[in-house]
């Protein structure tokens, strides 16, 4: 259960009429604050040691699960290696793996405060993870926030070729099976565009957001008690019968 937040976030278009994206600075990363932020179209993004910055970009990057098509290369990889895929089994391991330095930089925006805030949000039932395993080793995954039918992607990681893409494809199938209209990808980048993402105006995103967050949430229990095979997913293009 999420208690009411002690913070009130400003309306993004009023706080940022020029569309620069930064809405406000401050507050904390308690679950109630994160919940309040996401339901108003904001997310935290800041460097470790800096004040907490809350963003609502113009435009907003989203991807539509119903329109997503995995690449032929990804399908071949899923059939070749047959990894195991789970949901909500190792949320903290996933977010900590996402926080590790990448090959191209030693910096990370996923601070210990971010980790603790989202772990608590997960415990409250408003965050999710998708894990990719090779036997007992976690080799890829992603995490995000889920409120109603609102699905918000946060970060992903990969220790083997394509394992973050396998997690992403799995999330798209979850979205298809639960009538999730879009997955919020926040900021536009070339990698997301290559996966099929597109942009919405901030106004259109905020209007849609208010509709989706009041819808029945994703039924994660139907997935998290099972272990899925990447080979079977690639063959069937679905998770449940």
From Swiss-Prot:
Taxonomy, superkingdom: Bacteria
TM annotation in the entry: none
Localisation per UniProt entry: Cytoplasm
Protein purpose: Functions in the N-end rule pathway of protein degradation where it conjugates Leu, Phe and, less efficiently, Met from aminoacyl-tRNAs to the N-termini of proteins containing an N-terminal arginine or lysine.
UniProt keyword terms in alphabetical order: Acyltransferase, Cytoplasm, Transferase
Protein name stated in the entry: Leucyl/phenylalanyl-tRNA--protein transferase
Catalytic activity: N-terminal L-lysyl-[protein] + L-leucyl-tRNA(Leu) = N-terminal L-leucyl-L-lysyl-[protein] + tRNA(Leu) + H(+); N-terminal L-arginyl-[protein] + L-leucyl-tRNA(Leu) = N-terminal L-leucyl-L-arginyl-[protein] + tRNA(Leu) + H(+); L-phenylalanyl-tRNA(Phe) + an N-terminal L-alpha-aminoacyl-[protein] = an N-terminal L-phenylalanyl-L-alpha-aminoacyl-[protein] + tRNA(Phe)
Protein family (similarity comment): Belongs to the L/F-transferase family.
GO cellular component: cytoplasm
Organism classification: Bacteria, Pseudomonadati, Pseudomonadota, Gammaproteobacteria, Moraxellales
Listed Pfam families: Leu_Phe_trans
Enzyme Commission code: 2.3.2.6
UniProt xrefs under InterPro entries: Acyl_CoA_acyltransferase (IPR016181), Leu/Phe-tRNA_Trfase (IPR004616), Leu/Phe-tRNA_Trfase_C (IPR042203), Leu/Phe-tRNA_Trfase_N (IPR042221)
Chain's gene name: aat
Alphabetized GO MF terms: leucyl-tRNA--protein transferase activity
């Amino acid at each position: 259960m999420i208690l009411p937040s002690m913070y009130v976030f400003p309306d993004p278009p009023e706080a940022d009429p020029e569309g620069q994206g930064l809405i406000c600075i401050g507050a904390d990363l308690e679950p109630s604050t994160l919940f309040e932020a996401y339901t108003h179209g904001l997310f935290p993004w800041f460097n470790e040691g800096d004040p907490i910055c809350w963003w609502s970009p113009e435009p907003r990057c989203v991807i539509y699960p119903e329109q997503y098509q995995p690449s032929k290369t990804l399908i071949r990889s899923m059939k070749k290696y047959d990894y195991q895929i789970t949901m909500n089994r190792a949320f903290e391991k996933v977010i900590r793996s996402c926080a590790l330095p990448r090959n191209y930089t030693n910096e990370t925006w996923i601070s210990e405060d971010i980790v603790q805030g989202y772990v608590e949000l997960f415990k409250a039932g408003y965050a999710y993870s998708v894990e990719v395993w090779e036997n007992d080793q976690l080799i890829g995954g992603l995490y995000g926030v889920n409120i109603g039918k609102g699905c918000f992607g946060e970060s992903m990681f990969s220790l083997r070729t394509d394992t973050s893409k396998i997690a992403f494809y799995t999330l798209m199938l979850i979205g298809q099976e639960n009538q999730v209209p879009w997955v919020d990808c926040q900021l536009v980048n070339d990698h997301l565009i290559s996966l099929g993402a597109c942009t919405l105006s901030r106004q259109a995103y905020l209007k849609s957001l208010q509709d989706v967050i009041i819808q029945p949430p994703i039924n994660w229990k139907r997935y998290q008690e099972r272990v899925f095979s990447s080979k079977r997913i690639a063959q069937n293009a679905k998770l449940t019968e």
